[in-house]
A protein has these predicted regions:
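Acidic, low-complexity cytosolic segments
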Residues: 1-25, 32-150
Length: 150
């Protein structure tokens, strides 16, 4: 992923964490367990573990959906005594993982995650990236923000 697109994704994840109440951490992880974007305060050793867990659970979601012929999986919830782990699939095969407090408003967190998944899918889509690079050389795009680099 190019630097400009990584910056857009980091901005989206940081904005999500700052806006949504009771969210402790957020991460976008590739299908093969590589962290693509992390909220600011995730320690590096924890990031690798979180990415591996996220990709593993996402793979289990896909397997269950396939076995039960239930269509594409959209979300998984792991409820723990000290918090919630919510995972949503992103269109390119990557996943969004959010760790939130156990008493968070799960409907709000899930809704905001859906918005982030849609925006992240646009940033991560290879076809869209190629199209933007041809159409808008030297430009970056963020929701509600546009401008030239340099």
């Amino acid at each position: 992923m190019s630097y400009a697109y990584r910056q857009d994704l980091n901005w989206l994840v940081s904005d999500f964490k700052a806006r949504v109440p009771d969210v402790a951490h957020a991460a976008v992880v590739s299908a093969d367990g590589v962290p693509l974007s992390l909220s600011d305060d995730i320690p590096e050793f924890f990031a690798e573990q979180l990415a591996a867990i996220t990709s593993g659970l996402a793979s289990l979601m896909q397997g269950a959906a396939r076995i039960f012929e239930a269509g594409l999986p959209t979300q998984a919830l792991v409820e723990m005594m000290g918090g919630l782990m919510i995972i949503k699939a992103i269109s390119d095969g990557s996943s969004l993982c959010v760790l939130a407090s156990p008493d968070c408003d799960t409907e709000l967190v899930s809704y905001e995650m859906s918005l982030l998944v849609e925006a992240a899918g646009e940033v991560l889509s290879p076809a869209l990236r190629r199209g933007q690079e041809r159409a808008l050389p030297g430009r970056i795009s963020r929701p509600g923000v546009s401008g030239r680099l340099g």
